[in-house]
């Protein structure tokens, strides 16, 4: 059996885009930093997002059934740090300017690209929930380089 630490160390060697995944609802705005995001289908346009079930904001994503994947530009390392830290959700969102599209989920105004999504399916696998998300709107910026982990 592969040890969890060995798996995490090996996965850290894979280059991937850095994303801030956000949601909003009656209980407020929440978000987390994620690299486990990928395209599933172009028809219908669908993304896959993985989230640790132990995350304090996990329940809000489940209840809201919406999210936005905000792909960070190379100058937005501070947002990656903020959304992976222990600071409050309110403080996290003060670090940048946000807007909304179709779902009402927070969209980072100067992200490389943002995908506004409705969560259509949730699969539980090990420590994580896998959200299968239908994209309902896309916002692209003029940024040229993405932040890579």
Describe these PLM feature segments.
Residues 1-149:
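Basic, polyanion-binding surface patches
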């Amino acid at each position: 059996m592969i040890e969890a630490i060995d798996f995490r160390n090996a996965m850290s060697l894979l280059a991937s885009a850095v994303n801030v995944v956000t949601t909003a609802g009656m209980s407020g705005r929440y978000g987390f930093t994620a690299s486990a995001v990928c395209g599933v289908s172009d028809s219908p346009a669908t993304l896959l997002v993985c989230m640790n079930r132990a995350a304090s904001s996990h329940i809000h994503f489940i209840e809201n059934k919406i999210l936005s994947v905000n792909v960070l530009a190379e100058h937005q390392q501070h947002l990656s740090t903020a959304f992976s830290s222990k600071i409050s959700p309110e403080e996290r969102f003060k670090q940048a300017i946000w807007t909304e599209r179709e779902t009402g989920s927070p969209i980072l105004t100067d992200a490389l690209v943002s995908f506004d999504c409705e969560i259509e399916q949730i699969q539980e696998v090990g420590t994580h929930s896998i959200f299968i998300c239908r994209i309902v709107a896309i916002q692209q910026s003029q940024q040229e380089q993405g932040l890579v982990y």
